[in-house]
Amino acid sequence: SGLLFSLLYIVNGQYQLMLGLNPGYDYDHVAIVSIDASNRDQRNQCLAEIRRMPNVKDCSSTFNVPLDGYDRSGNMVGVPGDEKNTFNIMEMSGVDDNFFKMLNIPIVQGSFFTERNDSCRQVIIDERGAEKLIKTWHWKDGVVGKQITCTGHDNNIFTICGVSKNIRWGAVETGGDGMNEFPDLYFYSAKTAYYMLVKFNELKDESLSELQSKVQAMYPNNKVIV
């Protein structure tokens, strides 16, 4: 009986931990769709068709997903003219117009991207990153409107247009992983990115099967993952 009580205590503790975890974004009823070897025009067409499905509430897209098993990209952030002081960031290398709204990630300072085109030179940084920038370069008037550099880009100077709430990297049911120590930096994508996020009114097994069948029928020669 003592062993059984201990096991029940552990299970209950894990359940309460899961209830208390907040990844910082709304993942309820959201499915992730990807099409191997697809181009942006194909993804635009695909997402337009998905939006017409009767059980679909909303759609978005991104090149990075903050879950285990999906692409991650890390770079270094600094300010123009200072090559010594830099810090690591996790890069969300292309989110569309609906990403923050659909996943309910608040913009707490500044605004969403105002330059919505392929040559957008704006970025959104999370609160962790904003705090690091303020602490490192002693900015007393915040980060919105400031210029930063980010490695991995040909023209690597960007202007911060907004600050978002922090999100957690890793499995939803855990406390995340070591990447949570790194700030997130968001870039804009004018066209549909690789990972298409589909929010259903109610996510059921048949909803996923219908989604898989619809997308696969559109691109029979491509590998479709839902």
Predicted regions and their residues:
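"Rare, low-scoring activations can occur
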Residues: D41-S60, E127-E131, G152-V226
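Short, surface-exposed loop/helix-turn segments at secondary-structure junctions
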Residues: R72-E83, D141, E173-F182
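Short, contiguous acidic/charged loop-to-helix segments that flank catalytic cores in large enzymes
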Residues: V33-S38, E83-I89, F112-C120, I134-K135, ...
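Alpha-helical transmembrane segments
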Residues: G2-D28
